[in-house]
């Protein structure tokens, strides 16, 4: 046929049977990728430490999505929350992966069938005998069916009426588990961090989709609207479908990057804004303050801080710290976290408690500065020792750990104090194993960062695709060179440009 690569899809332009075939094949590829990727991730996933080596630290991408929909057990006998299971049932991680692969195979066969048997009676216009599709009717059918699926997900799966529910956790990502969710019909349902909004919005959107689908099935579009929006042209469908996809991609890029009830931090890792705002640090200090108010010692109060909460308050888990083109999981960067060393408290020789200024997200290096409770600089690690006034040696800074593995251990030698001051810039201090994975010490992003980058990039690309195909379908006659007001009979093939008598072909 001699088509250039960027025009090959024109072969299905006026061929409804094969248009259906290639869409079924596309579904087969998507489903097959999802199932295969799930099996690969399960093969490399280590479920042994859900606290310090969770799925997002290991770079898992599809396992978090399965988990948030209610899958927690594996045929390997482990549970995502830790511990063992004896009867995971068919809907385990492997069961879902297998179902996707089986579905992919069935779609593959269906696609081949529709490619071979493309000339079906259902695609034929009775009046003309030519292939045609009633696109407004098909739109109504799709709207109705997607409405039913949307309503069913919200009313049955999420609520636990017929299904497992979804992953729900507390604001600090400590107590997450799969549970049923009641719809939130009040103003709280519009809070992106309230799980009940997921149920209520799916029920509401599904109901609207069902009603809209029935409307489009029973009411024909006016002729002027039909012609104005080119409703008979399949490229109109392509353009509006691309619009729906890029809009959804922009939305989910936002909910992933900024955080929401649909993207729990236990499954996808914390957001960069939680580091920027000191979100976990404030909660840790609040808990310690509560402990001290209950007459606990400083050591006892810090020992009650969960390792999970302390681990969130570490810059290495900030998805904005990893470069976009640094391949690999977080564990391949700074290493596998082994244990929390404890919270370091620095003091100078005058007894002031000092706080290390934390590194902002977009800095790779940052000066080590220690300030007191009033924000006054008391010590630092100087760049030029000759001019220093606040060096650790001059000020006599010591460090003592509370909680963690180094509980009640103190250091006064300047080299060790400076080492822990540098590490305190990065949040809570953890022992990291870099040997096992040959980790290079350079931070990586979490699946939260990869998902956002991918979806924002493709959304932008698809936005231009929508503009391109929308313009092509709306101005098709202009691009084809046909004057819509041309009344004269035109002999096709007589002119190089249709309807332009100045371009009459010369007979050789």
Swiss-Prot record:
Where does it primarily localize?
A: plastid
Q: Name the SUPFAM superfamilies for this protein.
A: Photosystem II antenna protein-like
Q: Disulfide bonds, which pairs?
A: none
Membrane topology of this protein: Multi-pass membrane protein
GO-annotated biological processes: photosynthetic electron transport in photosystem II
Q: What does the cofactor field's note say?
A: Binds multiple chlorophylls. PSII binds additional chlorophylls, carotenoids and specific lipids.
GO CC terms, sorted: chloroplast thylakoid membrane; photosystem II
Protein role? One of the components of the core complex of photosystem II (PSII). It binds chlorophyll and helps catalyze the primary light-induced photochemical processes of PSII. PSII is a light-driven water:plastoquinone oxidoreductase, using light energy to abstract electrons from H(2)O, generating O(2) and a proton gradient subsequently used for ATP formation.
Q: What is this protein called?
A: Photosystem II CP47 reaction center protein
User: Which organism is the protein's source?
Assistant: Amborella trichopoda
